[in-house]
From Swiss-Prot:
Protein name: Iron-sulfur cluster assembly protein CyaY
Keyword Metal-binding tagged: yes
Pfam families: Frataxin_Cyay (PF01491)
Origin species: Escherichia fergusonii (strain ATCC 35469 / DSM 13698 / CCUG 18766 / IAM 14443 / JCM 21226 / LMG 7866 / NBRC 102419 / NCTC 12128 / CDC 0568-73)
GO biological process: iron-sulfur cluster assembly
General function of this protein: Involved in iron-sulfur (Fe-S) cluster assembly. May act as a regulator of Fe-S biogenesis.
């Protein structure tokens, strides 16, 4: 994967997250902001999830209250380089915990 392909894939990921949060109809207030390639999700209780891209490594990084995760693209899924879990699984687990209700991005 070259840098432009990586950025295209990361942009698609960011757009999907933003669209899902725009459609969010849960009880919690969840905000999403993109600034300089960093996507910040802020929850009603003040907690945050930070997602950023690491261009030199062609990785997506996810920072949550539970910890930090690094994802490599394998096939068509972003996979955690430590646990083997998918990006969407870990994001949904963290968002659900931080929102206090079920949050789905798929």
């Amino acid at each position: 994967m070259n840098d432009s392909e990586f950025h295209r894939l990361a942009d698609t990921l960011w757009l999907t997250i933003e669209e899902r949060l725009d459609d969010w109809d849960g009880d919690s207030d969840i905000d999403c902001e993109i600034n300089g390639g960093v996507l910040t999700i802020t929850f009603e209780n003040g907690s945050k999830i930070i997602i950023n891209r690491q261009e030199p490594l062609h990785q997506v990084w996810l920072a949550t209250k539970q910890g930090g995760y690094h994802f490599d693209l394998k096939g068509d899924e972003w996979i955690c380089d430590r646990s083997g879990e998918t990006f969407w699984d870990l994001l949904e687990q963290a968002a659900t915990q931080q929102a206090g209700e079920t949050v789905s991005f798929r």
